[in-house]
Amino acid sequence: MATTHTLLSFDDLEFLLHKKDLTDLYGERCGTLNLVINPYDLFLPDDLDDDWCDDPFNCCFSDVYTSIGTEYSYIDPPDLIYEEHCATNGHWPDGTPCEPILPPFVIEGTHHYYATKPGEAVSGILSKLGSAWDPDLQSTVDTKPDFVFRAESDGPGGADIVTEEQGTVVQQQPVPAQSALTTLAAASTGKTVDCEWTTFFSYHTAVNWSTTEAQGKILFSRALSPELNPYLRHISSLYSTWSGGIDVRFTVSGSGVFGGKLAALIVPPGIEPVESPTMLQYPHVLFDARQTEPVIFTIPDIRKTLYHSMDDTDTTRLVIMVYNELINPYEQSEPKSSCSITVETRPSSDFTFSLLKPPGSLLKHGSIPSDLIPRNSRHWMGNRWWSTIDGFVVQPRVFQSNRHFDFDSTTTGWSTPYYIPIEVTLEKLDRGGQYFKVTDTEKSLVPGLPDGWPDTTIPTAMTASNGNYDYTVAEYRITNNGTHFKGFYIMGNLTTKVKGSDNLGETQQTSRTLFASVGNYKDQNTINPTHKITSNSLVVYDANNVSAATAKTTTWHSTMSHLGYVLVDESPVGSDSTKVVRIATLPEAFTNGGNFPVFFTNKIQIGHFDRAHTKCFNSQVLMTSQKLAENHYTLPPDSLLVYRITDAASSWFDLGINHDGFSYVGISTIPELDFPLTFNLHGVQLAKVKLASKVKTSKTTI
């Protein structure tokens, strides 16, 4: 390659043939800029120290030499150079050919033209102009009156380019695993994905730190896994194993006013963190609540094998706990104040995947739940009653068995998470009796128990009389509620009567109203309440069974659907655990770490009173029950999957779902919200860390 390569304007290309023809082809662009730059500066590495080359067509830097442009013979006419250049460099999206950005130039002594590829020369020149802040760069530009070229904006401002604030890197022990192990583990596939998402931090979750948190309180505890980062979680579906560490960045929202310190410690695999100051006996580092810059910690991969399987949870754990309590010196009448800690993650340099698998292949372990609740409250339906959710009720104890599922896809109930008609065979208890029992069912999750059968029992012992309502009550008044069959569910029903004689009229299908509940039969006309459901405790009453047309019928095939409820008292349906039915055990949730369990409420229509309703308590949104039943999700038993609920007035609070499927909030009372509400996944946090909120709550001053 020649000693100097000069990119020339037409004013300097006097030795070239056919100057006029080239000018006609490229127009007045040529000659307006006289910029002399050494092509070494444009196309060759900065540290190149070779000053000459005796074989330019077998260049040592073939990739660089190729990027200069397309080679043409010195004797080719200019129009051929132009046409071949356009033909070999493609077309723009609108169909026009990619014309050369600059005229052809020559490498002295080679007798060849070089027409630069589109963008190559401009990219090189702009990169040099972009370094105009370097005083060592010298360029000569012919600034004629009609020449305007700007490489900067018109407005004032500094020349510094500011990147994302990375934060302070904290060095801690133990040292991450050697990269040689990673290389060996991924030897069959090599380095996997090397993309830009490996260089920046992605949001993981947010942790609330309040002035009520005592020393030793664990605010953040997560085991090393690809689930810590959204991009790693997505790519993990393509691989079977992984290895390597993860960088975690913490940003405290404090303004320099708060006082207090947090401790970060690495817990080795096989050790379970406990909420105690004794955890501070592990090697740890401290960071202050007044820290204005982010702090970065690395969770090292400590392992005894070459790689981890995707369901491996026995890994290194990063724990953030309170070292000194948070103090707000300006706190007065407020019971507490808090700040937020934002947690972001990115893979460390040694992180890699291995053992490729097809994306559709299912692994034994579960996935991280991100779609358990619909984003808009208009799509929320209760898992006890099929109407739309319209509120929340915080309780010290929440319970439900039927249609309630946990993160292991198990339920202690007898119904699937879908509202379907109940198909059963009914038979009279006795020839002269008023009640029917269920002798067979078409659809059942538990043998003998119809799918969708109600899960509450009657309040007291009940004797059938005439099966009708007490019409002396003209309007809804709890104090004078004398209706029969309190606690029964009103069922719309289509029956086919099994004939007991040759009377064909008895086989006709009829539409009628039935009453259904759970109870133990004392005699043919009396039932007692029970909180245990069996195939012998399913009670049905037909309001019209005393008529002469149906008195002879003893067996029916019935298809029923829920229509309403016969009111008991002012208590919501499902609020009394002694009246909630279960097969054996009743799943329950209690207050935990300052977080309170919550019921989802909706309305159930009560019988006889026109357009009257009562409240019904639900342990889950129906879609949550469906997702948990159909999928195996991964959530540690000591953690909450946190969603942020925002109403139309921008008030918000965090709602966490634990491993048992119950929901929690961090406030003891939820005020009236402006519906519709929106849900957004906020991440995973420890169950004992108080959930954040920003809602208007009533306060009492003593």
Curated annotation (Swiss-Prot):
The record marks 152-153 as: Cleavage. Keywords: Capsid protein, Host cytoplasm, T=3 icosahedral capsid protein, Virion. GO terms for cellular component: host cell cytoplasm; T=3 icosahedral viral capsid. Transmembrane segments: none annotated. SUPFAM superfamilies: Positive stranded ssRNA viruses (SSF88633). Homodimer. Homomultimer. Interacts with the minor capsid protein VP2. May bind to VP3 and Vpg proteins. Capsid protein self assembles to form an icosahedral capsid with a T=3 symmetry, about 38 nm in diameter, and consisting of 180 capsid proteins. A smaller form of capsid with a diameter of 23 nm might be capsid proteins assembled as icosahedron with T=1 symmetry. The capsid encapsulates the genomic RNA and is decorated with VP2 proteins. Belongs to the caliciviridae capsid protein family. This is Capsid protein VP1. It comes from San Miguel sea lion virus serotype 1 (SMSV-1).
